[in-house]
Each structure stands twice: as structure tokens, then as C-alpha cells.
Amino acid sequence: MVNEKKMLPKRIILMRHGESAGNIDAGAYATTPDHKIPLTEEGRAQAREAGKKMRALISTQSGGACGENWRVYFYVSPYERTRTTLREVGKGFSRKRVIGVREECRIREQDFGNFQVEERMRVVKETRERFGRFFYRFPEGESAADVYDRVSSFLESMWRDVDMNRHQVDPSSELNLVIVSHGLTSRVFLTKWFKWTVAEFERLNNFGNCEFRVMELGASGEYTFAIHHSEEEMLDWGMSKDMIDDQKDRVDGCRVTTSNDSCSLHLNEYFDLLDVTDDEE
């Protein structure tokens, strides 16, 4: 049974880490473990600026009885570059606004296979493009499908936190959940959340460094990008017209279907040769 009194987050904000040493020199992965790759000074500056922008967005867009009492709860990947990103982002907020943070291993980067020799990784990534980005498993590492499984587990835990008010949110406050993670992990999160297909996942472009995307609770009771982001932005992310239309429909509850479980696009893809009615009808 759904808890009628549970405090749904007003926003769920997905953010990629700032510029890292690995982003400017792929050779760094050959000598430094992926989880220890640091931010550059530019990455730190990006994170500080993103924190200011995030606070401004939340504070100016919050409204209603709970608007002035908005609070933020952070989930962060345990990698050095995400942890440092959060420290810099946090400088944009006061302690009053931040009610908690949890280091969460399940939102870490895709495992590309221990130390990554640049020449070998170039060949491996070319193979991935031919095989398919979602199902290709890196030697000694993970596929995006593996990441999907652990992100699915994280989502279940996150919603249990919401159901049981483990964030300890005052009912008079507006809750914002911020997930500081990685590019592929964030795209996988969205694929799980919106029940996108593998083909739709493979359309998506990566987040920029310290880019954050805002899912806000619409009047329909569903989360959508269309409140904070334009159609042009979503096109730049690689979303199709159908995916964008779905986001728009989530704002006010005008959706004809609730997921790709019953979407006519996907029904036609699998069952286009079926008769419209039973013979005996």
C-alpha cells in the first residue's frame, strides 16, 4: 500500500562530476586507479559554480507553503572526483539547507577494468561501438547492463528511504535529492527511471562536466525534465521526439500511457502483424 503521507522529493537532480585528470589525459588511467582520479583545478571551479547555480535554481523555483524551508539531501559516488565535486558544490549551500549526505557505491562509475592502458582501451572502445554500448562488457570490468542492475537496486533503496522518511524531512520543508555521479551511470539511471529501451539509451549523449539535469515533480505526480529544461536542451541530450513528448505530458498528467510497457510505439514494434480483433468477435 502506498503511504499517503510520505514526503515526495520536489526535485531529483542528477549531476556529473567536474573535469578530472582523466578527462584531459586518458593516459592517467594507466597509472592511477579510476576511483582515485582527481579533479583538475578547472573541475573544482566548475563544481563551485554549479553549486551556486543549483542553489539559485532551487531557491528561486521553490514556492508554496514549503518553499521557504527547502532542504537538500545528497547521494554521492565514492570516487575521488565525485567526492571532491560535492565538497565544492556544497560551498554554495548553508549547513541549514543540507540535511544529509550518503556515499553510495551503487552509483559509482562503470568499471572499465582496473588499470586502463591507453592503446588497449582504444581498441576495446572501438569494439564496444561495434558490439553495442549497453551490452558490451569491458574485460575485467562491467557492461552498462551491469550498471543498470546496481542502479536499479539503488533506486529501490532510495524509494524506501522516501517511504520511511529516512531523510528525516520536516513536513513543512521541500526536499531536493541531488545525485552526484558519473556520465554513463546517470544515463543508466534515467533509462531505468523512465523505462526507456536499450535503443533509447544508446541515443543519449553524455552529460558535460558538472552539468546537472533537473527532474521536478509535476502536477500529474510524475517527475519530468520539461519544467526546467527546453525541448532544444532535450534534443541536445539525444532524446527523440517521442521521449520529449512524454516528458511534456508528465507535467500535467496528459499522458495516454504510463511507460513503454504499453506505449503504442513499442506495441507496434513487436505486434505490428497481429489482427486488430479476435476472429470470433
From Swiss-Prot:
State the protein's name: Phosphoglycerate mutase-like protein AT74H
What SUPFAM superfamilies does UniProt report for this protein, alphabetically? Phosphoglycerate mutase-like
Active site per UniProt: 17, 109
Similarity section: Belongs to the phosphoglycerate mutase family.
Q: What does this protein do?
A: May play a role in carbohydrates metabolism.
Question: What Pfam family is a match for this entry?
Answer: His_Phos_1
User: Which residues pair up as cystines?
Assistant: none
The membrane spanning regions, by residue number, are: none
A GO molecular function term, named singly, is:
catalytic activity
InterPro entries the UniProt entry points to: His_Pase_superF_clade-1 (IPR013078), His_PPase_superfam (IPR029033), PG/BPGM_mutase_AS (IPR001345), PGM-Related (IPR052765)
